[in-house]
Amino acid sequence: MKERTIIETIKALFKRPFTIKYPYEPSPAPEGFRGKPEVDPEKCIGCGACARVCSAEGITIEDKGAERTISYFYGKCTFCARCEEVCPAEAVKLSREFELSDYDKSAFYVKVTVPLLTCRICGAPFVPKPQLEMGLEKVADLLKKYNIDIEKFRQIVEVCPNCRRKIENIEAGRKILMVMMK
């Protein structure tokens, strides 16, 4: 038995190694590997769906003035891919990158800034502009189908919830909804 083991060991020395020489040679990630989330700031609409589903609280939202900042902190990320699943704009994609260690802390943070739409009446910021534009694009065909003027609809939705309660604008919105629901 010992003799056979020694012979196999000597043969193995001259064959190719069984393991790769990581970290000196890159190791490919397996298929389906969930690595670092990559965020495309051009696609992000600022809806915050990713922050709402992040169980590790690695994604935060902060509204300051007329801007919304969404911050991604990879140090807390569990690579669950929930942010990728819920993003309506497909702005978040998980890469196959797994070597995330770095001495620079700023390498663990990604910030995306999105402008907020201000209310037509009071001027308070209340919804991300790209999110509203995406929503209007999605309902444009439906509005045309029911002969509803898209500009009139835009005026209704560009009023914050507080002002909407105070004016008759909500009645116009209800009428539009009633026409669409028939």
Where are these regions (language model features)?
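Phosphate/diphosphate ligand-binding glycine-rich loop within oxidoreductases
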Residues: R68
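Non-ligating segments of multi-cofactor redox enzymes
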Residues: M1-K64, Y74-K76, R82-E85, E90-K182
